[in-house]
A protein has these predicted regions:
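Gly/Ser-rich phosphate-binding catalytic loop and adjacent alpha/beta segment
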Residues: 2-28, 32-157
Length: 157
């Protein structure tokens, strides 16, 4: 599976539906956040589901590279679109050979707890935290109880 990464694409266009859109500016120091958009928004999305799938493939590759193994806990927040984003992330993780333990709808601390309860070193929590509807993001880690820092985020980018 491979993706062509695009810089900009209009929603509901052929390019938007077939290429991976994932803005590099979304990779922050300790997590990743993008404007996913919502109906009626004038702001163009910074991420699409193919982009999330590409992120999952990169994350699945990175957790093995750092020696964390293939197992990872995933969860998603309450936003109406977060489940779809998580499923795209999981698809990419599995394409990279990850074994996913999904806990479903959760708060971030629940995902971190699940790392210990399920004895899984890595985590990927789909959440936009305190940001308004339309935003999405992923908090990630591969060495419980720590989440990714600048070095890991730079490697993932």
């Amino acid at each position: 599976m491979s993706f062509s990464i695009v810089g900009d694409a209009r929603p509901n266009s052929f390019e938007f539906e077939t290429e991976a859109l994932i803005k590099p500016s979304g990779f922050r120091e300790y997590d990743a956040r993008w404007w996913f958009g919502h109906p009626g928004s004038a702001q163009l999305p910074e991420l699409n589901l193919n982009g999330v799938q590409a992120l999952g493939m990169g994350l699945g590759t990175l957790i093995r590279r750092v020696g964390a193994g293939p197992d990872i806990v995933t969860g998603h927040d309450f936003r109406s679109y977060s489940l779809g984003i998580k499923l795209a992330l999981v698809s990419g993780l599995m394409a990279a050979g990850a074994r996913v333990r999904d806990i479903g709808l959760a708060l971030s601390p629940m995902a971190y707890f699940a790392q210990f309860a399920l004895d899984v070193p890595s985590v990927a929590m789909v959440t936009a935290s305190h940001n308004e509807n339309g935003w999405t993001g992923v908090k990630m880690g591969a060495a419980r109880p720590l989440t990714f820092g600048p070095e890991e985020m730079s490697a993932l980018k």
